[in-house]
């Protein structure tokens, strides 16, 4: 039926199995979005990343996991392995189609749908308790925001969302501070002052 297929995979072997199976198929959907998207992508092998980039398989990852659930990662994987998890910089450099999500409501955090701890985790590569999560995989704030907005819309084929530009639906947030200018350590403190859908204010904090 030409629909995008979404599969969830955490762990090197699980990701490899999903990517290997998807790579055996030709693109079946009509739009520019990936025919298969794989959620989470904890610690993919280089071969899985290469195949995904070549076949146009999309990856959706959530740095909030290492930020919010650091104890579990350290207890089960150890810090050195954990530093290789959610390798955002490597994925971007590979050319694979990539975006962010919060994975709400599953995320173990005070406000699972809050995107700002996720962005902070991607930028600082530090957990809530300060644990180093692999700074070589960090991205800048603008890149993290784009992965959360434009790239997320593109991933699922929403062609008039994700950007503020002529002809788009004017869905946007007004924040209480400039996320591009504040110190990265303050990103999780950002508040939404207003939310606009289709150019109409549907939420105001004041």
Residue ranges and their predicted role:
Residues 187:
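Unchanged
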Residues 56:
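Hard-cation-handling environments
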Residues 184:
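Short, solvent-exposed loop/beta-turn-alpha elements that line the ligand-binding surface or hinge
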Residues 2-6, 13-36, 41, 46-50, ...:
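His/Asp/Glu-enriched, well-ordered alpha-helical/loop segment
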């Amino acid at each position: 039926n030409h629909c995008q297929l979404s599969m969830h995979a955490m762990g090197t072997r699980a990701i490899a199995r999903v990517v290997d199976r998807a790579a055996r198929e030709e693109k079946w959907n009509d739009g520019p979005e990936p025919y298969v998207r794989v959620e989470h992508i904890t610690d993919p092998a280089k071969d899985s990343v290469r195949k995904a980039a070549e076949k146009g398989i999309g990856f959706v990852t959530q740095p909030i996991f290492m930020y919010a659930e650091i104890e579990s990662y350290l207890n089960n994987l150890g810090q050195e392995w954990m530093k290789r998890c959610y390798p955002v910089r490597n994925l971007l450099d590979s050319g694979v189609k990539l975006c962010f999500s919060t994975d709400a409501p599953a995320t173990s955090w005070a406000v699972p749908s809050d995107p700002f701890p996720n962005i902070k985790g991607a930028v600082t590569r530090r957990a809530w308790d300060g644990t180093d999560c692999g700074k070589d995989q960090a991205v800048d704030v603008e890149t993290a925001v784009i992965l959360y907005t434009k790239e997320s819309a593109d991933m699922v084929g929403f062609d008039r969302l994700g950007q503020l530009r002529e002809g788009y639906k004017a869905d946007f947030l007004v924040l209480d501070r400039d996320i591009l200018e504040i110190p990265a350590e303050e990103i999780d403190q950002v508040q939404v002052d207003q939310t606009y859908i289709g150019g109409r204010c549907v939420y105001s904090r004041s």
